[in-house]
Amino acid sequence: MHQVHDMNDASQVGEARRRSVLMAGRLEFDEDTCGRLALVVTELGTNLVRHAGNGRLLVAARAGAAGESVEVLAVDSGPGMDLEHCLRDGVTSSTTAGTGLGAVRRLSDEFAAFSTAPGGTVVLARIASRRAVARARPQPAERFAYGAISVPAVGEIQCGDDWAIVQRDGRASVLVVDGLGHGPDAETAAQACLQAFSSAPCDAPCDVLARAHAQMRATRGAAAAVARLDADAREVTFCGAGNIAARLTSGLGDRSFLCQHGTLGLQVGRLQDVAVPWPEHALFVMHSDGLGGRWDLRKTPGLLQCDPAIIAAWLIRDHIGGRDDATVIVVRASAGSHA
């Protein structure tokens, strides 16, 4: 789950920095890494207050081949910016200790940004522990790049949505789950589904959901979907129950997947996999019903080519609605996966 920090006033920057550094401390980041993270959060938060007038910082831990990192997304609907100009040191928040967006890029282990004028900006920064990177063993290159965001309903601390992705042998298994309602009982249902997925994530999607259905009987139930993405066969195998949306989208068109009616843990119809071709250059997007389904990435030129985390943040910014938890995951086959 991402921490959500509204950035409407300079006083909110310090709280975002404090909570982000606490997160890094729980991950046992070293002092240098915590310092880099503090500067990044300060710069991005200050930029939102000064130049966007409003906006949000989304902060979460993220697992990777080299260990865990902290992901920071700065999201706004402001006037947009000239990224090439603003990435020069000192151009944006030049009176802070880090000297602007250029410093954010330099301090980050991963960095990306996208902006339209008008239309707003999303900046992505990931900060990894130097110690974790140093001790990590060489890992095979992951075949899929992804970005995922999960945020609780307004006023809630716990989130009834969750997601997971497991990559093995050129395949990825992806889960999105939405516990009924929101709050602690919804979170309990979602965690039961996540445990069923984690026990054997590479099983056929219908088998994963059947196992989750059986293990969730004591909960209030959930909507959930599982997709198995195959980079070599260029195929997506999908099964879902309830109100989870999934779509393959590219510059040429979209293809949506249908879920079975019902609720895992309560009552659900026959769970059956469907396999469809994965067109080259298409993204796979799956989300809970906390995100509206009437989105079209093609309406924003350049967005389809962005880092999946930036696309996920853009969708959350523009299409979240109502008082519900929301989760979205965006997956792209890495360069060279589609031979």
Spans of features found by a protein language model:
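C-terminal catalytic subdomain
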Residues: V4-D9, V13, A210-R220, P279-A339
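N-terminal entry segment of metal-dependent catalytic domains or homologous docking segments
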Residues: S129-L180, D185-Q195, Q267-G269, D273
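Conserved beta-strand-loop-beta-strand hairpin that lines the nucleotide-binding pocket
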Residues: M1-H5, G45-Q139, R168-V174, L229-A231, ...
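Short acidic, Gly/Ser-rich segments with clustered Asp/Glu that frequently serve as metal-coordination loops
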Residues: P79, G179-A186, G290-W295
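PP2C/PPM family metal-dependent serine/threonine protein phosphatase catalytic domain
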Residues: Q139-G160, L209-R217, G242-A275, P279, ...
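Catalytic core of PPM/PP2C metal-dependent serine/threonine phosphatase domains
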Residues: D185-G253, L258, L271, V331
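Bergerat-fold GHKL ATPase/HATPase_c domain
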Residues: M1-L39, R137-Q167
